[in-house]
Amino acid sequence: MRVHSLFLKDFRNYSELRLELGPEMNSIFGLNAQGKTNILEALYILSLGRSFRTSRLTEAIRFGSSHFFIEAVFSQNQVFHTLSIQVDKRGKKILFDGAPITKLSALVGLFPVILFSVKDTTIIEGSPAERRRFLDLLLAQASEKYTGQIALYHKALDQRNAAIKTQDYKTIAAWNSPLIAYGSLVALLRYECAKKLHKIFQNLWDNTLKETLSLRYESSLITTESPTLNDIASNYYEQLRLANTKDFELGYTTVGPHRDELIITLNDLPVSKFSSEGQKHSLLAVLRFAECVYLQEEFLIHPLLCMDDIHACLDQNRLDQLFQLSTSLGQTVTTSTICPNHLDSNSSIFHVTQAQVSLVTSNFL
């Protein structure tokens, strides 16, 4: 994917902005609170229909305005598309090439964006649910079918849990089959994704910090290195049977992919407990790079890589190494308080001050 232009209207501190992006590295610099991160937030909202900074999109409406409007012109496989979103107090309106999108599940994957943010450490420090969500979002960007599978699994899980609470044995039995069918596929797809990410992650990490890194998907349903869907389904059936008494005691389903974990270790130690802040930020940055490589290699998808406030959390040595990696990933947008001096001739540099964006240098625009 190549993003050609971004238009903002009454979004955050921008009354109006039209930004033409270069095809490779786009570096945006300026003092704090000038509007740098707002540009990345707008791109992220177009990708997923939600913000990484607030749970309420109406908070992004510029003070005194009734709504905000974001639009991007981009191309995939040399075909141009337009994607826009308008948000007001009544809700949001999303258009793709002029046609309305009414479900966010249909939006995911149309405009793939991978975001690295200094504040986004929940994948490393957060609960297992955060890491499961990380895998689910990556798989959803690659395939709309996965979004449907995970939704069907959670529907079956919710129905089974409701039946457990009322001790409705007949309904529990009825939901076991769809729970096993959808859950087994979710577990297999996550496992395969994590396995491929591990190899990519190791290669990228070895090229930067020369430390031993491991990423693996841990599931009670998967007991072999190369599981089949039937293997997982058989294990799930047996584990549900054995967990019946425990499920009734606790009031919910205790086995399944909703209990699985993505384990990340550095030098055989959990990164959440034994890594420095610098290591965590470097690891997270490389993990985002690995997502891009995974989408490119497995699905021929070239997402936009966005990196926010990079000088705040990465030292110059790590920055140089990561920027060297980014040259092979396609289009990238970064923000920083420091004017970049490490970029090559294929870069576009923008300066932001009080919501005014000016082009400093570019060989493309």
Swiss-Prot record:
PROSITE patterns: RECF_1, RECF_2. The keyword DNA-binding applies. ATP binds at residues 30-37. One of its GO terms (cellular component) is cytoplasm. Signal peptide: none annotated. Keywords: ATP-binding, Cytoplasm, DNA damage, DNA repair, DNA replication, DNA-binding, Nucleotide-binding, SOS response. The RecF protein is involved in DNA metabolism; it is required for DNA replication and normal SOS inducibility. RecF binds preferentially to single-stranded, linear DNA. It also seems to bind ATP. NCBIfam families: recf (TIGR00611). This is DNA replication and repair protein RecF. It comes from Chlamydia muridarum (strain MoPn / Nigg).
